[in-house]
Curated annotation (Swiss-Prot):
Transmembrane segments: none annotated. GO terms for cellular component: nucleus. Gene3D superfamilies: NAB conserved domain 2. GO terms for molecular function: transcription coregulator activity. The modification Phosphoserine is found at S171, S182, S327, S405. Signal peptide: none annotated. This is NGFI-A-binding protein 1. It comes from the Eukaryota. Residues 220-309 are annotated as: NCD2. It comes from Mesocricetus auratus.
Length: 485
């Protein structure tokens, strides 16, 4: 089975590693799965590495996996073992500035390309030098091919570790290209798109900032000898001086400045790189900001927040636009399954309304019951009061009948009692009896409605009571024998 040949620089590096591990049979599988980036294999965690091994069909052969791991470790610690003469290969996955200096494809950096390219851009936007392109010339048949490569971000530079990194990595910063006295910097820099976004944002912000007074700056430098010794020469340079921007970048850096105590090998983050670039651009617009680092830091952070948000949002949208995937936040509703959420909510609201109505009705029934009880209590009290009045009336009747009879017996005062004996005749009975019957009629009318609904027995007792009391009074009277004298 013929092995495919590498076509790019990334594929060539993978080819050399697999060749050293005697695993060239997996080269085609790696290329089919998009595994032409060796750094991805070196940086992958345990789970991700095992997943890659499963994709290329190496997971079932642990000895092959160990040979590949050993080759990757050798490539990280000593990349020189894998350097082979390169042919005319297009650079795709590995940036050219990370090639060793001895590589035939390394031809150095041309800073003049910045002046050539900047003239074709808008005149009011000044492109930073860290976004300058590099020239790459191939060796094929004496013909040169010029290609532009943007400087990669800090995430890629972190992948190159080991003692060979200081030898193989070549800085593209203007400080290394320009003055030899400039501080030593790493290859960390923003890519062209991010640097251009910073320049645009600084251009908008510079129009809103107040213009600094040059006389005040000179007075400040005159009073501060240390500051004047450090940055005084920058204010004496003309704007056409090519080294002025390099010096501004040198002393305007917020993070990782040449006089900072940052540990060697500690790389700057994307935020720190953006802040440094924004500070440099702001100081290029207004040199006086070099003397006010607190204000410069605040403005640079503001630019960094805006640029990072816009750049990340744009990049994310571009990546998401290439995928035809559903949003993870979208609720998936399958066809054929009705949505019961709304009917359940409607039923719940109806049940709540019914329960509220029942509670209101029960409270009303309770109030009506209490009112009925109060009415019954009042009627009972009135009934007892009338009974007491009736007893008093009966007592007065007996007393008055005794007063009119000289021998203690009532005298006859009506014609209807003429047939009765004298001792049974009761005077004033005709006058007093209607009083009781009137009271009886009033009581009947008063308790007729209450007695029908609550107690029918009370009404019978109440109606029969005056008659029984009257007959009882008649029965109490005893007849006395007539005196024979």
């Amino acid at each position: 089975m013929a092995t495919a040949l590498p076509r790019t620089l990334g594929e060539l590096q993978l080819y050399r590693i697999l060749q050293k591990a005697n695993l060239l049979s997996y080269f085609g599988a790696f290329i089919q799965q998009g595994g032409d980036d060796v750094q991805q294999l070196c940086e992958a965690g345990e789970e991700e590495f095992l997943e890659i091994m499963a994709l290329v069909g190496m997971a079932s052969k642990p000895l092959h996996v160990r040979r590949l791991q050993k080759a990757l470790r050798d490539w990280v610690t000593n990349p020189g073992l894998f350097n082979q003469p390169l042919t005319s290969l297009p650079v795709s996955s590995i940036p050219i500035y990370k090639l060793p200096k001895g590589s035939p494809t390394w031809l150095g950096i041309s800073c003049n390309s910045y002046e050539r390219n900047s003239s074709a851009r808008e005149p009011h936007l000044k492109i930073p030098k860290c976004a300058a392109t590099t020239c790459v010339q191939s060796l094929g048949q004496g013909k040169s091919e010029v290609g532009s490569l943007a400087v990669q971000s800090v995430s890629e530079s972190r992948l190159w570790q080991g003692h060979h990194a200081t030898e193989s990595e070549h800085s593209l910063s203007p400080a290394d290209v320009g003055s030899p006295a400039s501080p030593k910097e790493s290859s960390e820099a923003l890519d062209a798109a991010a640097a251009l976004s910073v320049a645009e944002c600084v251009e908008r912000m510079a129009s809103t900032l107040p213009k600094s007074d040059l006389n005040e700056v000179k007075e400040l430098l005159k009073n501060n000898k240390k500051l004047a010794k450090m940055i005084g020469h920058i204010f004496e340079m003309s704007d056409e001086d090519p080294h002025k921007e390099e010096e501004i970048r040198k002393y305007s850096a917020i993070y990782g400045r040449f006089d900072s105590k940052r540990k060697d090998g500690k790389h700057l983050t994307l935020h720190e790189l953006t802040v440094n670039e924004a500070a440099a651009q702001l100081c290029v617009k207004d040199n006086a900001l070099l003397t006010r680092r607190d204000e410069l830091f605040a403005l640079a952070r503001q630019v960094s927040r805006e640029v990072t948000y816009k750049y990340t949002y744009r990049t994310t949208r571009l990546k998401c636009g290439e995928r035809d995937e559903l949003s993870p936040k979208r609720i998936k509703v399958e066809d054929g399954f009705p949505d019961f959420q709304e009917p359940v909510q409607t039923l719940f609201q109806q049940a709540r309304a019914k329960s509220e109505e029942l509670a209101a009705l029960s409270s009303q029934q309770t109030e009506k019951g209490m009112a009925k009880q109060m009415e019954l209590l009042c009627a009972q009290a009135s009934y007892e009061r009338l009974q007491q009045e009736r007893r008093l009336t009966a007592g007065l009747y007996r007393q008055s009948s005794g007063e009119h009879s000289p021998d203690g017996l009532p005298s006859d005062g009506s014609d209807g009692q003429g047939e009765r004996p004298l001792n049974l005749r009761m005077p004033n009975v005709q006058n007093r009896q209607p009083h009781h019957f009137v009271a009886d009629g009033e009581l009947s009318r008063l308790y007729s409605s209450e007695a029908k609904s609550h107690s029918s027995e009370n009404l019978g007792i109440l109606k029969d009571y005056p008659h029984s009391a009257f007959t009882l009074e008649k029965k109490v009277i005893k007849t006395e024998p007539e005196d024979s004298r």
